[in-house]
């Protein structure tokens, strides 16, 4: 059965508070599966399985699938629809409260697949990256605006702290755009399927990751201000900051959106040296 048929079979009522939009376009489903490159060596963690349409395809291809679902009304539906699969584990919990490192312990090839509710997209991605969770890739359907921020380059309005965070840890690839007509109920915004492939090492080597991300966040907190004004929030004396900018070879009158990840790394290391 397809998604619409399962929804009708169980007379499921969508929960607006959970941002539920179920995928009904089979071509998008196929592109997610192909893009995620799932094989029998992989453990898949799926966030937001809905009624299990994508989950079935994952179960056919993966070694095992762990699906995380918050909505208690979906639990019996998933249990019934996927009862024939012995490689399926259903977790009834808020994904924001999951200990992903514990879940991934002693598993070698882990890939995440998710149709993320828009309100949890950035917190989930940030947690998975900063907590150094052991995953190979993350294939997600997210709001078009967020995907464009993740995939942005310096000197454009989409480029920001989320861009730097994701590209510090991952290569990014947009798989396809998805129209609102591909879902029930129909969302008000376009979506994009994007894949994040985890790098074996962060894109730049820095002396302090904590300082690096503090510099990045401070640089984008007030986008229209210069680096000099933005980085005053670090509470470093004027002479030391002048020294750091000079050593990094970066003009303090530039704005954060003009710096590459490598330049952010160089600047944070020079600040680290003068602390």
UniProtKB/Swiss-Prot annotation:
Catalysed reaction, written as an equation: adenosine(1518)/adenosine(1519) in 16S rRNA + 4 S-adenosyl-L-methionine = N(6)-dimethyladenosine(1518)/N(6)-dimethyladenosine(1519) in 16S rRNA + 4 S-adenosyl-L-homocysteine + 4 H(+)
The UniProt annotation places S-adenosyl-L-methionine binding at 21, 23, 48, 69, 94, 115
Q: Which InterPro entries match?
A: KsgA/Erm (IPR001737), rRNA_Ade_diMease-like_C (IPR023165), rRNA_Ade_Mease_Trfase_CS (IPR020596), rRNA_Ade_methylase_Trfase_N (IPR020598), rRNA_adenine_dimethylase (IPR011530), SAM-dependent_MTases_sf (IPR029063)
- Pfam families from the entry? RrnaAD
One molecular function GO term is:
16S rRNA (adenine(1518)-N(6)/adenine(1519)-N(6))-dimethyltransferase activity
User: Does this UniProt record's set of keywords contain DNA damage?
Assistant: no
List the keywords (alphabetical): Cytoplasm, Methyltransferase, RNA-binding, rRNA processing, S-adenosyl-L-methionine, Transferase
Primary localization class, coarse:
cytoplasm
Q: Where in the cell is it found?
A: Cytoplasm
The family this protein is said to belong to: Belongs to the class I-like SAM-binding methyltransferase superfamily. rRNA adenine N(6)-methyltransferase family. RsmA subfamily.
Q: What is this protein called?
A: Ribosomal RNA small subunit methyltransferase A
The species this protein was found in: Clostridium botulinum (strain Kyoto / Type A2)
């Amino acid at each position: 059965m397809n998604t619409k048929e399962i929804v009708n079979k169980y007379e499921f009522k969508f929960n607006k508070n959970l941002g539920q939009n179920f995928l009904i376009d089979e071509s998008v489903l196929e592109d997610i599966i192909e893009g995620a490159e799932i094989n029998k060596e992989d453990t898949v963690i799926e966030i937001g399985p809905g009624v299990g349409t994508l989950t079935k395809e994952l179960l056919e291809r993966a070694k095992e699938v762990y699906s995380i679902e918050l909505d208690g009304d979906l639990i019996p539906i998933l249990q019934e629809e996927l009862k024939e699969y012995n490689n399926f584990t259903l977790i009834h919990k808020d994904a924001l409260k999951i200990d992903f490192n514990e879940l991934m312990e002693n598993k070698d090839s882990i890939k995440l697949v998710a149709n993320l509710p828009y309100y949890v997209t950035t917190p989930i991605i940030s947690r998975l990256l900063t907590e150094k969770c052991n995953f190979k890739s993350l294939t997600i359907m997210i709001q078009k605006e967020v995907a464009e921020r993740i995939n942005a380059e310096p000197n454009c309005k989409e480029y920001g702290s989320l861009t730097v965070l994701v590209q510090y840890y991952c290569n990014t690839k947009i798989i396809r755009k998805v129209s609102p007509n591909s879902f029930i109920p129909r969302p008000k915004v376009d979506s994009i399927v994007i894949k994040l492939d985890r790098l074996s090492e962060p894109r730049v080597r820095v002396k302090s990751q904590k300082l690096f991300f503090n510099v990045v966040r401070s640089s984008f907190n007030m986008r229209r201000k210069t680096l000099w004004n933005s980085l005053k929030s670090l509470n470093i004396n004027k002479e030391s900051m002048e020294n750091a900018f000079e050593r990094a070879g970066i003009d303090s009158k530039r704005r954060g959106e003009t710096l590459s990840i490598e330049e952010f790394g160089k600047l944070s290391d020079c600040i680290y040296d003068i602390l």
